[in-house]
């Protein structure tokens, strides 16, 4: 289940890339007085993120159902806490980070999203002592709203900071 249409753009960063960039900033005299963005250069839609998660886990890509955020909230969903659906952040207009300054001044080379996600998933598998998820709420949403899918729209243009 994706809130709204799932076309919201999101831009991630692999934690190892943040650490590497921070070390380069500390070691570079040229970095003094500058701010740098750490991010993957490619923004992804929510649909793409779910697809990449399925690939990283080596499972069949799930069928995605888009349900408007207000209906998820009316049914008892919450953007922060149990029954979390991507949080408020994921409904905002896309804000993407420009990383060319870090690339140019510090030779920043972000890890490919799929590569970083696969490595993160492997680590997750090593430490997954989490309880089995309860999908009762999702099943109820699908029964009530699952067929009401809005027509797909292209994502809004990102705002670069």
Name the predicted role of every residue range.
Residues 1-13, 24-25, 30, 37:
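A conserved pocket-lining segment of Rossmann-fold NAD(P)-dependent short-chain dehydrogenase/reductase
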Residues 2-8, 32-34, 66-70, 94-97, ...:
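Short C-terminal domain-edge/linker segments immediately following a structured domain
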Residues 6, 11-19, 35, 43-47, ...:
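Conserved loop-to-helix N-cap of the C-terminal "lid" that shapes the substrate pocket in Rossmann-like
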Residues 24-87, 119, 128-161:
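Mid/C-terminal beta-alpha module of Rossmann-like enzyme folds, strongest
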Residues 27, 98-99:
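Acidic/polar helix N-cap motif
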Residues 99-133:
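A contiguous, mid-protein "functional segment" used to position or interact
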């Amino acid at each position: 289940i994706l809130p709204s249409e799932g076309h919201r753009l999101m831009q991630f960063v692999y934690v190892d890339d943040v650490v590497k960039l921070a070390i380069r900033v500390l070691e570079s005299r040229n970095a003094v007085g500058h701010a740098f963005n750490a991010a993957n250069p490619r923004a992804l839609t929510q649909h793409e993120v779910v697809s990449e998660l399925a690939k990283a886990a080596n499972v069949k890509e799930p069928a995605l159902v888009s349900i408007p955020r207000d209906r998820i909230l009316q049914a008892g969903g919450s953007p922060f806490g149990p029954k979390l659906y991507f949080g408020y952040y994921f409904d905002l207009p896309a804000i993407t980070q420009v990383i060319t300054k870090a690339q140019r001044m510090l030779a920043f080379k972000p890890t490919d999203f799929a590569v970083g996600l696969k490595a993160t998933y492997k680590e997750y598998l090593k430490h997954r002592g989490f309880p089995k998820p309860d999908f009762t709420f999702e099943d109820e949403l699908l029964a009530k709203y699952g067929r009401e899918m809005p027509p797909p729209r292209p994502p809004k243009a990102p705002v670069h900071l």
